[in-house]
Amino acid sequence: MKTIITFIIVFGILVLVHEFGHFYFAKRAGILVREFAIGMGPKIFAHRGKDGTTYTIRLLPIGGYVRMAGMGEDMTEITPGMPLSVELNAVGNVVKINTSKKVQLPHSIPMEVIDFDLEKELFIKGYVNGNEEEETVYKVDHDATIIESDGTEVRIAPLDVQFQSAKLSQRILTNFAGPMNNFILGFILFTLAVFLQGGVTDLNTNQIGQVIPNGPAAEAGLKENDKVLSINNQKIKKYEDFTTIVQKNPEKPLTFVVERNGKEEQLTVTPEKQKVEKQTIGKVGVYPYMKTDLPSKLMGGIQDTLNSTTQIFKALGSLFTGFSLNKLGGPVMMFKLSEEASNAGVSTVVFLMAMLSMNLGIINLLPIPALDGGKIVLNIIEGVRGKPISPEKEGIITLIGFGFVMVLMVLVTWNDIQRFFF
């Protein structure tokens, strides 16, 4: 149960932060966000904000989505011949269109649709009250709403508030905002993980950190913050020098020369033996030195962010030199990592979230249609050509990209199931 909760929290936060980036910059650009959903699947709660956006909570707590007016996935559910009802305002304009059987409007007028335009001309024409001898045309208010089949009430999407009506620079920024939010979140989480761990491990010093009570080092008199100058007359400059000698000498007395408060002391430490992957190594019970000052912690967050980015790009590069599904991971791998992280502690969960956030941001910027990177490429092509690609061609390109992503996800998920459960 702990693993499931961890997975839901991790996945949910990453996706919602990503979608909020699109949401915020769409709003700034004057693009109508028809719905901001938390979760997926059937709606369990909805609230229409004064900003024109409907905020919903859906049954499955896995991520969420943003519906921007005029985007490919935002389709009008009205078709000629459809029975529906309309609600009028005081001047006779339609302010509400009900296509749902789940919702009843007490003052609505039933009609069968003949024709409509909710983008440019803003009208709806049909037979009212079953009278097929007379066609009635109603003007539709610019801010009218439509109640969809599942009962969700959203604003109609006139052309002037659609995605394509915004400036090209605003559309590029709106597409980029999701990955950008993931990068910002990644840095914040990496920095938070450093704070939760107490600081940044410094492996380039001969100064030691925490000494485990009752361990060989503690019993020999070694103390936290001691500087180990030499072991058996071999100079120690960094933590790796220290561990190399200790691991090679299980149950053998070692002469340590340490500096403490400006004075040198000589101690005899006997590493205890420990089995690690069929090898016997020495351990003395000492952790690396940790920098705990604020600048070091902030720099640690930056360094972890840069290291993560480098690792992701190296992994992506390796796909072109030797492609293997084992180099990719989907929801199943994410669940497995969540299980391991939840057992390791809060700081490990935070670090995992940071890694996954950076992954999500970078993967979404790949120039694949249906991903944010693919949309940005289409925006750039529009800027070069001076006009957008036709909606038909863009739809085909997006469909191909979506199909590619879906096939890859199925293969990766199946491969993960085989790896972890069989």
UniProtKB/Swiss-Prot annotation:
SMART domains noted in UniProt: PDZ
Membrane-related topology note: Multi-pass membrane protein
Enzyme class: hydrolase
EC code(s) of this entry: 3.4.24.-
Cofactor dependency: Zn(2+)
Domain PDZ positions: 179-273
Entry annotation: catalytic residues: 19
Binding locations of Zn(2+): 18, 22
Classification via InterPro entries: PDZ, PDZ_6, PDZ_sf, Pept_M50_Zn, Peptidase_M50
Name the UniProt record assigns to this protein: Probable protease eep
Organism (species): Enterococcus faecalis (strain ATCC 700802 / V583)
GO cellular component labels: plasma membrane
Family under the similarity heading: Belongs to the peptidase M50B family.
